[in-house]
A protein has these predicted regions:
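Amphipathic, oligomerization/interface secondary-structure segments
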Residues: 1-138
Length: 138
């Protein structure tokens, strides 16, 4: 169940990025030292994390590391890439909560909800433990 929620949330954010943030994701790809031919899920998640970083209180380097871990976890499950390490339950759970919060940020921003009201969401379950979740994504 947790894995399905993780995969569905990844897909939602990847689709949003493809439709509405493709240029921003391309800029992340260009700055990636391990450039690929195209924009990958890692670049899309990293772009969204960078956009959300003021609210999340994370650095640019953390955005890259988190995006890499999340992308590897998604690839493990969707491509049955057994060369990768199976993500832990804690990593999947924490990644799911982080991605779900980013999805809320996207939706609330599109609805015109002010940033200070969005920041209030972090005080409520399950988002009050966002710092803990970020630390569990490894």
């Amino acid at each position: 169940l947790k894995t399905n929620r993780f995969l569905n949330t990844c897909q939602c954010l990847e689709t949003y990025s493809c439709c509405y943030r493709n240029e921003e994701a391309k800029k992340v790809r260009v700055s990636d030292p391990n450039k690929t031919k195209g924009v990958t899920l890692k670049h899309r998640i990293e772009d969204l994390l960078i956009e959300a970083s003021p609210c999340l209180g994370i650095t640019r380097d953390q955005c890259s590391t988190l995006a890499d871990t999340i992308s590897n976890a998604r690839n493990y499950y969707t491509h049955y890439d057994k060369k990768r390490t199976k993500p832990t339950f804690e990593c999947i759970s924490a990644s799911t909560e982080l991605l779900h919060f980013i999805l809320l940020l996207v939706v609330y921003s599109l609805l015109g909800i002010p940033e200070n009201a969005i920041n209030e969401c972090k005080k409520y379950t399950p988002y009050k433990n966002m710092t803990y979740y970020i630390g569990e994504i490894k």
